[in-house]
UniProtKB/Swiss-Prot annotation:
This is Serine/threonine-protein kinase ATG1. It comes from Sclerotinia sclerotiorum (strain ATCC 18683 / 1980 / Ss-1) (White mold). Residues 547-573, 939-951 have a biased composition (Polar residues). The gene is ATG1. One of its GO terms (molecular function) is protein serine kinase activity. It is found in: Cytoplasm; Preautophagosomal structure membrane. Residues 359-368, 432-442 have a biased composition (Basic and acidic residues).
């Protein structure tokens, strides 16, 4: 059923169209195939929800689903299932008159939990059970809604129904029975029966939950299997995502995702598409962790984890589910008048229909179950933080005990974290998750101790202290995992900065800086000749530099070999040339170019961004001993490779960014000084761009920034793992190793530290720009016509997260906008242009830069986020094929990887040929010109052979 929100915020376009005895009024919700209106029953004036489906938009399968929904709703009569009042069909529409749920859906309820007190029907609930500042709903409210959802699911299960689309958007809410009994303001909602507003379970003073939208439901006995892909991806069971046959246990997964979202405020897994979502689920290895700031009792966490098992046979069974203490037991923590009115009688009777058993409900209300032993708010808090005082022998026997080393939330040795599909910018996503082993290593680095929960008041309980310590570790690990999710990128920034600060402040590295360096030279490490450090110094703040137009000190001369770009950074001239190559195609596509100073012309070009790396590289001019590369040096190479690729992707994103947000007038001028543009014109960000162009540019810039962030994150994770290993081994200072090995370790430590500082600065900068682009995208989407697919009103409900503070909140991207596709197309275009220029012998150095940049882009496309230390890239396409035969990598299937590898190999070949040609030209130009014979003239007489004296 279409998601419905309170009319104050979503009502529009009054209709006032008559359908039978009902009148269609304003729109209150919109789904994929139907629009929901507020309607009025004319004889009684009662409110109904009218789901209007345009038959012309439905194919045969969707029509069949609609008729199935109608038949199912006609046969279901349960207080926690939305009732069907009437159904009318015309030549063009089918109108379903259903119960009106004025509080909207559970998704809206969770999202707006901080504003619920503004609704008069919810004021008392918030007063008694305030919502947590961080996380989801109050534990009492979570248990209340979960009981009512379980009652509806049990009713369906007894009739062999599988819903197949359980999600917060399909869980609708009405005011509590107590509030409706005493409130007489305004028209009432039409009731299917008197029992339809009397809850089977839960608390009378809290809102009542009703399950809706049976468009995908079907009768499926426990022995049958279905194989139709349906439902909402974020809440789909893994077996459905794998296109496997499934049974009723698929609903158990969806219930677990809803419970997790009620507890934490977010789904357990988020991704841009179902392929990436499935990979995240599978790589999570059934380790469901909860954020550190969410406080819930053990039994609630237990049942959530038992729902969220990737294999259906590992999940909790339906009998176990319906008999679980969370479902059958009392709700702890009730206050005030809720204590004696708690309704806890389960609805497990196969014939628990309200219409068939009204007397049972009356007996339940007349003889409430005695209140539990522990009913005070203080006892609830004690249970929340680990003191599980037994309420009754039955409940205590069913309470799981979590002990260190045996927690379902602890990472296992086989964990492989999900990585963001660099191909697709997430609707709600994503920075990449890295390997769990890195998470375990990297979590403690630089994290302030004060961030962990403290339970000093119970330090005298050794057993509880041990449990709490285990919980803290699990929660810290979850923080790191969440930080690598794109929607929680701010936490990742905290981790990146903390780790960089720790390395910068390390006395061991400070001591290592005073040890003389072993003369060595890698063929790929060439710094600027006039720079003692071999690279450019880091400015105090690149953000200030860009805002004020400050120039950086000029450093001349590009490195000797552009081919070394993959291992180290570039000089300013190299970076400018790369930027020039990157923006070349944009001139043709968008008609927008940069001023000369932005493409490297002039003695002191103003840098768009800090070229990589801005830290000391090994001194040039020394020759090494050509020994095999050691492990430390390999780590250095991998970190610098990943950082360099991120720099290329960042440069591509900057092309889009500068078209969206032009430079200030102080920076936007050429060698002749400020141009004659008016300041107002220069600051008009949307000058010359249509709204659709702004949306497209914003989406492209955002996905490229996300890709750059993923590569930066990988560099930091590799450095974090290396740092932890060195801290354990204590070999950075090299005091107990041979001289050359000691010097190598020292140099590796210095270079990794420099790389970490560069990554930290770049990460913060990219994060800030990604947020600016996100805001611009959201604003531009609102300016689109209402009938445009990109307008917020036409976004799918499951992907629509508006008003959040994270980098991707409120972002819905157009289909097909992926980082890989953009990078692949740009690499092809750059290489083709370079090939044309090469054949014409024009701008050969520029051709070399274009080839190199294209190679780095394609390498970034193929980057495997699942390998901290990747295997060496094979020059053979056949060997690369064997390496990626295992399936998809970062959402790219083998066929696509094969195509990219072929293009990559061709460009490498062209680069190799170009370098040979340039070397031949250089040798030819360095040769002295041949000396021409000089002729002597004496008195005008020309010497002849006859005049030559004989020998």
């Amino acid at each position: 059923m279409a998601s419905k929100t309170p009319s104050s915020s979503s009502s529009r376009r009054p209709r006032n169209v008559g359908v039978g005895s009902f009148t269609i009024n304003e729109e209150i919700g919109k789904g994929s195939f139907a629009t929901v209106y507020r309607g009025t029953h004319v004889p009684s004036g009662s409110l109904v929800a009218i789901k209007s489906v345009n038959l012309g938009r439905l194919n045969k399968k969707l029509k069949d689903n609609l008729y199935v929904e109608i038949e199912i709703l006609k046969s279901l009569h349960h207080p926690h299932i939305v009732a069907l009042m009437d159904c009318r069909e015309s030549t063009s529409h089918i109108h379903l008159m259903m119960e009106y749920c004025e509080l909207g859906d559970l998704s809206y309820f969770i999202k707006k939990r901080d504003k619920l007190a503004d609704n008069p029907s919810l004021f008392d609930m918030i007063r008694k059970y305030p919502m947590p500042v961080d996380g989801g709903l109050n534990q009492v409210v979570v248990r209340h809604f979960f009981k009512q959802l379980s009652s509806a699911m049990e009713f369906l299960r007894d009739r062999d129904f599988v819903h197949r689309d359980v999600k917060p958007q399909n869980l609708l809410l009405i005011p509590s029975p107590d509030w409706m009994a005493k409130s007489k303001n305004g028209p009432e909602a039409m009731k299917a029966s008197k029992e339809s507003i009397v809850p089977m379970v839960g608390i009378n003073s809290l809102p009542m939950l009703k399950l809706a939208d049976f468009g995908f439901a079907r009768s499926l006995p426990s022995t049958s299997l279905a194989e139709t892909l349906c439902g909402s991806p974020l809440y789909m069971a893994p077996e459905i995502l794998r296109y496997e046959k499934y049974d009723a246990r698929a609903d158990l997964w969806s219930i677990g995702t809803v419970l997790y979202e009620m507890m934490t405020g977010k789904p357990p897994f988020r991704a841009a598409n179902h392929v990436e979502l499935l990979r995240k689920i599978e790589q999570n290895e059934d380790e469901i962790r909860f954020p550190s700031k969410t406080v819930f009792s053990r039994d609630l966490k237990d049942i959530a984890r038992r729902f969220l098992k990737k294999r259906p046979e590992d999940r909790i069974t339906f009998p176990e589910y319906f008999a679980h203490p969370v479902v059958t037991g009392p709700i702890p923590g009730l206050v005030g008048e809720d204590l004696p009115k708690e309704i806890i009688t389960p609805s497990r009777s196969p014939e628990a229909s309200v219409a068939r058993h009204p007397s049972l409900r009356e007996r339940q209300r007349e003889n409430p179950t005695p209140k539990p032993v522990e009913t005070t708010y203080e006892s609830l808090i004690a249970r929340d933080i680990g003191e599980q005082a037994p309420r009754s022998p039955h409940i205590e026997a069913n309470q799981p005990v979590e002990i260190p080393g045996h927690k379902s939330g602890r990472p296992g040795s086989r964990d492989r974290p999900s990585a963001i599909s660099a191909a697709t910018a997430p609707n709600v996503d994503t920075l990449p998750r890295q390997r769990d082993r890195t998470e375990r290593h990297y979590a403690p680095i630089g994290r302030p101790v004060s961030r962990k929960p403290s339970y000093d008041e119970q330090a005298n309980l050794p057993v509880q202290e041990e449990i709490r310590s285990s919980d803290s570790i699990t929660e810290a690990e979850q923080d790191v995992r969440d930080a690598r999710e794109y929607v929680l990128v701010e936490k990742k920034a905290v981790e990146v900065n903390a780790f960089a600060d720790e390395m910068a402040a390390s006395p061991r590295l400070a001591h290592a800086n005073h040890i003389p360096k072993q003369p060595t030279r890698r063929h790929t490490s060439m710094g600027a000749p006039n720079s003692t450090s071999g690279a450019v110094a880091v400015p105090p703040s690149r953000a200030v530099q860009k805002a004020q137009g400050n120039t950086r000190p000029d450093t001349s001369s590009a490195r000797n070999s552009y081919g070394s770009y993959g291992k180290t950074g570039s000089s300013p001239s190299t970076a400018s040339a790369i930027a020039k190559a990157l923006q070349g195609a944009s001139v043709r596509v968008f008609g927008v170019s940069w001023s000369p100073t932005l493409i490297g012309k002039g003695p002191s070009p103003q840098q768009l961004y800090n070229p990589y790396p801005a830290y000391p590289t090994p001194n040039t001019g020394f020759i090494g001993d050509a020994r095999p590369i050691d492990e430390d040096q390999r780590v250095v190479n991998v970190i610098e490779d990943s950082a360099t690729r991120s720099d290329v992707v960042y440069g591509f994103a900057e092309v889009k960014y500068r078209q969206l947000i032009p430079l200030a007038p102080s920076m936007n001028h050429g060698l002749g000084g400020p141009n004659n543009e008016k300041v107002g014109d220069a600051m008009d960000e949307d000058d010359g761009l249509t709204v659709e162009a702004i949306v497209n540019l914003s989406e492209e810039a955002l996905v490229l920034y996300v890709k750059s962030l993923s590569l930066l994150s990988k560099s930091m994770d590799i450095a974090g793992a290396w740092w932890l290993r060195k801290n354990r081994g204590g070999v950075i200072s090299g005091g107990h190793t041979p001289g050359s090995d000691s010097s190598s370790a020292v140099q590796a430590g210095n270079r990794i530290n420099g790389a970490v500082q560069w990554v930290r600065t770049r990460f913060n900068e990219v994060l800030e720009k990604a947020e600016l682009v996100r805001l611009k995208l959201v604003e531009a989407q609102k300016r689109l016509p209402e009938d445009h697919p990109g307008h917020p009103s036409n976004h799918a409900t499951a992907s629509k997260i508006v008003g959040g503070s994270s980098t991707t909140d409120g972002v819905v991207l157009s289909s097909g906008i992926t980082a890989e596709k953009l990078m692949y197309d740009r690499a092809l275009e750059m290489s083709r242009t370079a090939a044309i220029n090469e054949l014409a012998n024009e701008d050969l150095p520029g051709c070399e830069i274009s080839y190199t940049t294209a190679i780095r882009m394609l390498e970034a496309v193929l980057e495997n986020d699942e390998e901290l230390i990747p295997r060496k890239r094979s020059p053979s396409l056949r060997e690369d094929k064997e390496k990626c035969d295992g399936g998809e990598v970062n959402g790219i299937n083998f066929g696509d990887r094969k195509d990219v590898l072929k293009v990559l190999q061709m460009i490498r070949t062209r680069l190799h040929v170009l370098k040979k040609k340039m070397a031949v030209i250089a040798r030819h130009q360095s040769m002295p010109p041949p000396s021409s014979p000089r002729h002597s003239h004496s008195g005008g007489t020309t010497p002849t052979i006859a005049n030559t004296p004989p020998h």
